[in-house]
Amino acid sequence: MHKFIAAVAALFLSPLAQAQETVHFPSLDGTTRLDAYLYRPAGEGRRPAVVGLHGCSGMFSRATGAIAPIYREWAAELNRHGYVFLLVDSFRPRNANELCSVQGFDLELYRSRPKDAYGALSYLQAQPFVRGDRIGLIGWSQGGGATLFSIGNRSLGRPATLPQGDFRAAVAFYPASCNIERQPSDWTSRIPLLVLMGAEDLWTPAAPCKTFLDAAIGRGASIEMQIYPGAYHGFDAPNQYRLELPAYRTRAGVVPIVGTDPAGRQDALSRVPAFLGKYINMP
């Protein structure tokens, strides 16, 4: 019995299962001191890393106040593959709760998030346990839109100099602003990008995003796109039953629907690490 208890205790105290560490650093907007949550994988030595940008409802569960399961599970998955994961809170340091509703949306805050991404890159590059030239970026929903604004050749956040290099790769889950109306007409990026979307997503529809990305590919961007049949917004969340969100009705009158798609989620759990590994771990 004592051995069993010790084994269970060791499991929960292992580096792989350790709780996140809260850290702070400046956004490159010049005024905001950001909060972020650092998850480190087991083992010693310098590791590659990933910056995470949450969606428009923030990174915390409305029900529990804890970091939402979708981000905790991705943190664990990325740690399992050897990545340090830094989840950036763009909202609470600016006294914002959500940017999903028409009433709550703040364009200035949204467009400042690429500066948060590059503030996070700078923070990670200064850490002795991170390989500063091997860092990726992942964004969900509005954080996915911020990812597009970050990695474009005319980035809203990129500083003039990057001594240890830029992001090596980026992933955008069902990104906002993924269309020709919200992005520059000549948008392209030197950073390889993976975009994952649900075919039934009413909030950030796949069709206009595909049109936009196809045009960027034609201009030389390296982009992979995966559209999951039958999947809604937030398909990669764990155990999220299908749910309508009337409080976040769009200006066009669309009521968003979120929900887990088991097949899409499982594919993403393998596709994302494979994509990151291809570009972040290359010589």
Question: Residue locations for each model-derived region?
Answer:
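Acidic catalytic loop of the alpha/beta-hydrolase fold
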Residues: 200-204, 233-234
